From Swiss-Prot:
Keywords on record: Acetylation, Amelogenesis imperfecta, Cell projection, Cytoplasmic vesicle, Epilepsy, Nucleus, Synapse
Residue numbers carrying N-acetylalanine: A2
Protein name: Protein rogdi homolog
A GO cellular component entry from the record: axon
Entry-linked InterPro entries: RAVE2/Rogdi
GO terms classed as biological process: bone mineralization; brain development; enamel mineralization; gene expression; hemopoiesis; locomotion; locomotor rhythm; memory
Compartment list: Nucleus envelope; Presynapse; Cell projection, Axon; Perikaryon
Clinical condition linked: Kohlschuetter-Toenz syndrome: An autosomal recessive disorder characterized by severe global developmental delay, early-onset intractable seizures, spasticity, and amelogenesis imperfecta affecting both primary and secondary teeth and causing yellow or brown discoloration of the teeth. Although the phenotype is consistent, there is variability. Intellectual disability is related to the severity of seizures, and the disorder can thus be considered an epileptic encephalopathy. Some infants show normal development until seizure onset, whereas others are delayed from birth.
Tissue: Widely expressed with highest levels in spinal cord, brain, heart and bone marrow. Also expressed in fetal brain and liver.
Length: 287
């Protein structure tokens, strides 16, 4: 019995020593690794023109789709803003070519990119608030920090992977419709959003429903992408979507950022798992 108790005490001492090493050394090593990865992610969002200061450089992306050639164009991205859009639309019925572009004095902020960048900055702030000289006293303290960092990273990722669901009146009321010169025809709506690593542009063609129409008017709810036949009321008119054209372009640095988010979340979870393993060795929570 004495031998068993001695062995148990020895094992406990070893475990306690390992846990102290984890708190004092490995935790800080992981925090440093996370900081380095997230700083790389942050750089992807800023894309400075020279050095680390100055305006973000402009990048041109050609819009394309494997399903249609009705819409062609080029989008110019400058950091978190769309600084130019040059779009050609071939009308399905008469093959008339419409051209519209941003007014020179206008830029369209992509809120998804801005929000994702802010969440990354908040995660970095949380990590740097515990520098190398800081001594973690309990595992619970580490778990709390990891949970807070993971929350910011999950929010950053979700902003890029989950576009907002908008109603057609919300799209019609958006300032984006007033960005173009010449002004968009009244039977067109345009929406721009991020989906994963892609910048997507959707053009909706509309037609007015006659007051004596026998169609059962049912306003469409919110959606990322509305389908032909979706109806809505705008002003005194009832309108229906007749055609939908979606084109997109891949933004390579958004793909990089998503990879960094995934790797960082995995590192956080691995550290949480290591901390939690020690709780299984004691009937009480020593951390």
């Amino acid at each position: 019995m004495a031998t068993v108790m001695a062995a148990t005490a020895a094992e406990r001492a070893v475990l306690e020593e390992e846990f102290r090493w984890l708190l004092h050394d490995e935790v800080h090593a992981v925090l440093k690794q996370l900081q380095d990865i997230l700083k790389e992610a942050s750089l992807r969002f800023t894309l400075p023109g020279s050095g680390t200061e100055g305006p973000a450089k402009q990048e041109n992306f050609i819009l394309g789709s494997c399903g249609t050639d009705q819409v062609k164009g080029v989008l110019t991205l400058q950091g978190d803003a769309l600084s130019q859009a040059d779009v050609n639309l071939k009308m399905p019925r008469n093959n008339q070519l419409l051209h519209f572009a941003f007014r020179e004095d206008k830029q369209w902020k992509l809120q998804q990119i801005q929000d994702a960048r802010n969440h990354v900055s908040q995660a970095i702030y949380l990590l740097t608030s515990r520098d190398q000289s800081y001594q973690f006293k309990t595992g619970a303290e580490v778990l709390k920090l990891m949970d807070a960092v993971m929350l910011q990273l999950t929010r950053a990722r979700n902003r890029l992977t989950t576009p907002a669901t908008l109603t057609l009146p919300e799209i019609a009321a958006s300032g984006l419709t007033r960005m173009f010169a010449p002004a968009l025809p009244s039977d067109l709506l345009v929406n721009v959003y991020i989906n994963l690593n892609k910048l997507c542009l959707t053009v909706y063609q509309l037609h007015a429903l006659q007051p004596n129409s026998t169609k059962n008017f049912r306003p469409a709810g919110g959606a990322v992408l509305h389908s032909p036949g979706a109806m809505f009321e705008w002003g005194s008119q009832r309108l229906e979507v007749s055609h939908v054209h979606k084109v997109e372009c891949v933004i390579p640095w958004l793909n990089d950022a998503l990879v960094y988010f995934t790797v960082s979340l995995q590192l956080c979870q691995q550290l949480k798992d290591k901390i939690s393993v020690f709780s299984s060795y004691w009937s009480y929570r020593p951390f």
